Structures are given as structure tokens and as C-alpha cells.
Amino acid sequence: MAKTQGHMALQDSTQNEDRRIVKSKRALRGALITLMETKGFEAITVNDLCSAADLNRGTFYNHFSDKEDLLVSFENEVMETIALIRSEMALLSVKDVMAYCVSKKPLPFLVRLFDYFREQGDFLHAVMGPGGDPRFGSRLRDSFCTNLIQGVLHEKYRNDPDPFVGYYISFYASAYLGVINHWIDTGMKEDSQTMALIAMRLLFIKPGEPIRL
């Protein structure tokens, strides 16, 4: 009985500690977002972060080595979730994508993606803004947007060494990053289904066609 009670006490202690860690990281994340928006990441100090999060420096250094480590850890969390959503794309053929386009139905994984972007809107607005991390936009472009474009290309072009194919992919990947940026910068007014349709429509619109959804 004593062993059981001791085990339960240890579990409760661990759970309480886990909750404290989650609470501390959430507070630091909120502080980081606010400070990137107000003074820019380069000007932020660990003292600024601790003061804004109402935490002591010891708590900060229990989890992160410096402010860059803090930022990258949150960026990595976002990129890992995006990668999971992106993996759904591998299950789709070009024929599947075209069928959604013809029926004017949004691709489900794109809807989930924009749902996640909305959920992370405050962080994305800060980190992709002028006071954020200019490297993050490049990561998003290279790891997600490029893969998205490659995924909807006909199979024979996906590994084509022709330089023009590389320029084509680079052009559309950068354009898609611009779409995401514009949506976030303008307050994410469109819902996720509409944004998924916009993303699909932009890829297949032809020269001379009306610029309408």
C-alpha cells in the first residue's frame, strides 16, 4: 500500500512538473511574440523575455540556452506539424488534384494547413514580419511550398534536371509563400476552405483567363 501511494505521489509530482513546464513555455512563447512585434527579435534580451513572461532567468535557462534556441524550438514545432500535414499530399496523384480542381472542391490537406496557419497566426505574423526571423520564410518556402509544387507536377517533371523546371518550381514556391504572407498580413479574413481554393486556382489559372476564384 505504501509503495502504491508513493508511486501515485511520484506520478502527481511528475504531472505537476510537466504542467509547469508547459505553462512556462506558453508564457515565453507569448512574450516572444509580443516582443518581436514591438521591438524586433534582434533587440530582445533574455531579461526582456523573462520580465514579459513573469519568469525568472533560472526557469528560462532550464529549457533554453539563449533566445535563438527559444525561437528555433518554436519554429521547429511549427515546421514539424506542417510536415505532418504535408505528408497527406503524398497520397494524392495529379489526377486526384485535377479532380478536386474541376469540381471546385478544396483539397482537404490544404484546408487543414490553413486551419493550422490560422491557429498559429500570431506567431507566424510575428516571425515572418519585419521584427521576426527572415530565415523562417525561406524554411517554409523550401520545405513546404516547394514540395507542394513538386507534388502537383506531372510525374515526368518531378525529378527533371532541366533548369527551366527548377525555375518553374522556384517561381511558384515563392509565389505561394507570398500568398500565405498576404493572408496573414491582411488579418486572415478568408476562411480555410476559401484559401485552399485560392491556392489551387492560382496554380492552374491560364493567361488571359478572368482573375476570379
Q: What feature does the model see in each segment?
A:
Residues 2-39:
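Basic, helix-initiating cap at the start of DNA-binding domains
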Residues 3-5, 163-185, 193-205:
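Hydrophobic alpha-helical segments that form the core
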Residues 20, 90, 124, 154, ...:
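Terminal, non-globular segments
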Residues 131-156, 166-174, 208:
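Amphipathic alpha-helical packing segments from all-alpha helical-bundle domains
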